[in-house]
Amino acid sequence: MNNNIIHYTLDTLGLRCPEPVMLVRKQIRHMQNGEMLLVIADDPATTRDIPGFCQFMEHTLVRAEMERPPFRYWVKKGK
């Protein structure tokens, strides 16, 4: 993560599916390609939904901490 600057942080603690992914999508729409978003979540569904979202939308999941909540995801905007 040395060269990856976090440009935005999105706290979705307490929110449940589908809200975290909807908020990630909304935030990424307003970002430039290559910018990094740190997502903090405690919904177990995000361990499946956020990696799936990144793959489907062609963003890069740079790093994920999914061992126990709060989960953290570093998402770099693609395209």
Swiss-Prot record:
Subcellular location(s) per record: Cytoplasm
Signal peptide per UniProt: none
Domain of life: Bacteria
GO cellular component, one term: cytoplasm
Active site (record annotation): 17
Major location category of this protein: cytoplasm
Gene Ontology MF term list: sulfur carrier activity
Keywords of the record: Cytoplasm
GO BP field: tRNA wobble position uridine thiolation
InterPro entries listed in its UniProt record: Sulphur_carrier_TusA, TusA-like, TusA-like_sf
Coiled coil: none
Gene3D superfamilies, sorted: TusA-like domain (3.30.110.40)
Family: Belongs to the sulfur carrier protein TusA family.
Role this protein plays: Sulfur carrier protein which probably makes part of a sulfur-relay system.
HAMAP family: Thiourid_synth_A (MF_00413)
Protein name, entry field: Sulfur carrier protein TusA
Organism in which the protein naturally occurs: Actinobacillus succinogenes (strain ATCC 55618 / DSM 22257 / CCUG 43843 / 130Z)
